[in-house]
């Protein structure tokens, strides 16, 4: 079974760059406090890195 990580949106997407909004949607995050579980892959890690100031990650 692949390792998973929990990602929680902690800040609003209002007023952010369209690229950052698209990254949040790509991760499956829609609102503040929303948490999703994703497979721990380099692609997901890159997306998290792009919006690291807006999300909290739990291993």
From Swiss-Prot:
<dbReference type="Pfam" id="PF00327">
    <property type="entry name" value="Ribosomal_L30"/>
</dbReference>
<dbReference type="InterPro" id="IPR018038">
    <property type="entry name" value="Ribosomal_uL30_CS"/>
</dbReference>
<dbReference type="GO" id="GO:0002181">
    <property type="term" value="P:cytoplasmic translation"/>
</dbReference>
<dbReference type="GO" id="GO:0003735">
    <property type="term" value="F:structural constituent of ribosome"/>
</dbReference>
<dbReference type="InterPro" id="IPR036919">
    <property type="entry name" value="Ribo_uL30_ferredoxin-like_sf"/>
</dbReference>
<dbReference type="GO" id="GO:0022625">
    <property type="term" value="C:cytosolic large ribosomal subunit"/>
</dbReference>
<comment type="subunit">
    <text>Part of the 50S ribosomal subunit.</text>
</comment>
<keyword id="KW-0687">Ribonucleoprotein</keyword>
<comment type="similarity">
    <text>Belongs to the universal ribosomal protein uL30 family.</text>
</comment>
<dbReference type="GO" id="GO:0005737">
    <property type="term" value="C:cytoplasm"/>
</dbReference>
<keyword id="KW-0689">Ribosomal protein</keyword>
<dbReference type="InterPro" id="IPR005996">
    <property type="entry name" value="Ribosomal_uL30_bac-type"/>
</dbReference>
<dbReference type="InterPro" id="IPR016082">
    <property type="entry name" value="Ribosomal_uL30_ferredoxin-like"/>
</dbReference>
<dbReference type="GO" id="GO:0000027">
    <property type="term" value="P:ribosomal large subunit assembly"/>
</dbReference>
<protein>
    <recommendedName>
        <fullName>Large ribosomal subunit protein uL30</fullName>
    </recommendedName>
</protein>
């Amino acid at each position: 079974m692949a390792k998973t990580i929990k990602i929680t949106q902690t800040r609003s997407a209002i007023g952010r760059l369209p690229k950052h909004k698209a990254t949040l949607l790509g991760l499956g995050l829609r609102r503040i406090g929303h948490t999703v579980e994703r497979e721990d892959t380099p692609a997901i890690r890159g997306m998290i890195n792009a919006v690291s100031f807006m999300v909290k990650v739990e291993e």
